[in-house]
Regions:
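Short, structured segments at the rim of ligand-binding sites
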Residues: 1-288
Length: 288
């Protein structure tokens, strides 16, 4: 989001991030900004963004991430003229996109979502109150802990209904689960661990999880394998045999600069022990 906002400025801004962000392919966003007349020195952080955005048109493949569209919408108050966006692909992470559209609407944006969107400058009017939902994507971490220790650490009803809670409920159904993470790929690691200890199942709709802080399909396989839990890659996600239990790893667990992988490994280690390498990345989610 910062990159899109910086691109509206008449000048150059250098943007950098931690190791996990430096590993991410940001080409969907950087390519879009170049189509709008900006200079972007690289497709990965660190890079220099030289604006401003000029009126024009481009397209976004929504099957990769919701973040490119969200960033452009949030930056649009700084536009100097109309920008036309054509949307392609099967959209993922639609809940987060919807949150962007809802909060922008509360702040004065009069546009809406569609296959073709026209964005122009608008005046931000700060609302008196905006309710930000709780970070429900951390719920499976709590559920995993409870499953391992027989506790009830969190009132899961407080999160209401969402694509993430739907996926969690399917995984908890008590049978062989078929879970789509089209809109909830962030929870793939803890959910796979939970399913492996239950009846098992398949996770689908998670191809875009490969573009996170790590390739979360393969990194989840590697991490769980270290705990003696065996799962397999499929075309869209993971195939997970049930009836498994974690064992103490024989060596350090590489958290791969991925905070969600590190949190899942840490919870498993509370039951069987283990040494984590790079667990400090958890501060991305929980500073301090």
């Amino acid at each position: 989001f910062v990159t899109s906002i910086a691109a509206c400025l008449d000048g150059s801004v250098e943007i950098d991030g931690d190791l996990s962000l430096r590993k991410r392919d940001l080409s969907p966003l950087t390519s879009a900004l170049r189509e709008l007349g900006c200079g972007v020195s690289s497709d990965c952080l660190p890079y220099i963004v030289s604006g401003p955005i000029i009126p024009g048109s481009f397209w976004i493949d929504e099957s990769f991430s919701s973040q490119t569209l969200s960033g452009i919408i949030l930056a649009s108050p700084g536009f100097s003229g109309e920008v036309k966006i054509s949307l392609r692909g099967e959209a993922v992470s639609r809940w987060y996109r919807g949150l962007t559209i809802e909060t922008s609407g509360l702040s004065g944006w009069t546009g809406g979502y569609g296959e073709t969107m026209i964005l122009d400058s608008w005046v931000v009017e700060t609302p008196e109150r905006v309710v930000i939902p709780g970070e429900v994507s951390l719920c499976p971490i709590s559920l995993l802990f409870d499953n391992l220790h027989g506790t009830n650490s969190l009132d899961h009803c407080q999160f209401g209904e969402s694509s993430i809670t739907d996926a969690i409920e399917e995984a908890k159904s008590g049978g062989y689960s078929h879970v789509s993470l089209r809109d909830a790929s962030d929870i793939i690691a803890p959910l796979a661990a939970l399913m492996s200890m239950g009846k098992g199942g398949v996770i689908v709709g998670a191809s875009h999880a490969r573009g996170k802080e790590s390739d979360r399909i393969m990194s989840t396989i590697r991490m769980l394998s270290s705990f003696g839990i065996e799962i397999e890659e499929n075309n869209e996600g993971l195939t997970i045999p049930g009836g498994q239990s974690p064992n103490q790893p024989k060596g350090p667990i590489d958290c791969e600069d991925d905070h969600r992988l590190a949190m899942t490994a840490a919870v498993l280690a509370t039951k069987v022990g283990g040494e984590l390498s790079g667990h400090e990345i958890c501060e991305v989610t929980h500073p301090g």
